[in-house]
Amino acid sequence: MPKLVTWMNNQRVGELTKLANGAHTFKYAPEWLASRYARPLSLSLPLQRGNITSDAVFNFFDNLLPDSPIVRDRIVKRYHAKSRQPFDLLSEIGRDSVGAVTLIPEDETVTCPIMAWEKLTEARLEEVLTAYKADIPLGMIREENDFRISVAGAQEKTALLRIGNDWCIPKGITPTTHIIKLPIGEIRQPNATLDLSQSVDNEYYCLLLAKELGLNVPDAEIIKAGRVRALAVKRFDRRWNTERTVLLRLPQEDMCQTFGLPSSVKYESDGGPGIAQIMAFLMGSSEALKDRYDFMKFQVFQWLIGATDGHAKNFSVFIQAGGSYRLTPFYDIISAFPVLGGTGIHISDLKLAMGLNASKGKKTAIDKXYPRHFXATAKVLKFPEVXMHEILXDFARMIPAALDNVKNSLPXDFPEXVVTAVETNVLRLHGRLSPEYXXK
């Protein structure tokens, strides 16, 4: 039976096996179980001897891959993978994935040193960023057969290595430092069309605003190559060693992986975890008080900016030695306000991915949510009332200046339509905070 050897920073963690019936099993290596660095690959796959055969194995590895069936088909076509199954796809592109996981076929030897790369010219960078238009997955252009990466999510993206001011393609098992996200474009739905052609600017703006309001988010910059604009987001699951000679991978996983769930149920409405489940899980964090506070603060922020995609795969935890864990920075933040006014899109259609508690059931409609719903949610979760009021009061006090500061920091060619759409609606919802909380 074929096996994929699983590594974390050059330490053998275990083996992923695909059985004849297509089932996936995982077994931790004895040397990993005995190591002082030992930690579970996933909190849904506790350290243990013997084969793990639960559905969590398939789901964990499947969640390392792009969500889009189209992108998965491109991977099959590009590398002649045997199927769309996680084992077969990761056999081809598992050298650099989310967190610290590196997957290498047991019969394959990686000859490149730990850190090796090829510097990209601007023309070459543009080729990588536009590869999806030629049906090439994740920027893995045909001339670079040693460039094998996996990036989860639904958006067109790739991952690259930044060395100084240069963008580089990593070689062998060299990690990447940045996720590069392309404009989403138009999304056609049965009754509506979402114009997300300015998603790069949208996400950049939202990240700046989040940082201005004290939320922990990654650094990002807009990059240009030829006629392409993209968002380069610094990976928080990567860190240089003290000498800056080796780039380390930091173990992490998203909440679908944590709960052993497939990505198909990442939304609460589809059966995925909501605020209550994640807040209960964060009680076990090594920084429980901070993580629970930050998570609730981020729920308010998502409401204020009209962020509708805060599902389980967009929240993650670092996995530390021994199996302790803590919340990662927040990521994949985009406002739906700039798409309002498009074909069939109204503010009444915008819904939070995770519902708030209300007098009757859950409140998800952004335009129908008020501070009282956050207070009610906090009460149900036994989150301190004083902490919830502090969060709301801080937003009431900080929002106007934060909006001004972000606007003043933007480049001259930044699309005004994005700023105006987000600002106008944030201030409108901010008005619901002010009477009750601005003076507190």
Swiss-Prot record:
Autophosphorylates intermolecularly on Ser-150; phosphorylated form not seen to bind ATP and no longer has kinase activity. The keyword Membrane does not apply. Transmembrane segments: none annotated. The active site is at D309 (proton acceptor). Pfam families: Couple_hipA, HipA_C. Keywords: ATP-binding, Kinase, Nucleotide-binding, Phosphoprotein, Repressor, Serine/threonine-protein kinase, Toxin-antitoxin system, Transferase. Toxic component of a type II toxin-antitoxin (TA) system. Phosphorylates Glu-tRNA-ligase (GltX, on 'Ser-239') in vivo. Phosphorylation of GltX prevents it from being charged, leading to an increase in uncharged tRNA(Glu). This induces amino acid starvation and the stringent response via RelA/SpoT and increased ppGpp levels, which inhibits replication, transcription, translation and cell wall synthesis, reducing growth and leading to multidrug resistance and persistence. Belongs to the HipA Ser/Thr kinase family. This is Serine/threonine-protein kinase toxin HipA. It comes from Escherichia coli O6:H1 (strain CFT073 / ATCC 700928 / UPEC). The gene is hipA.
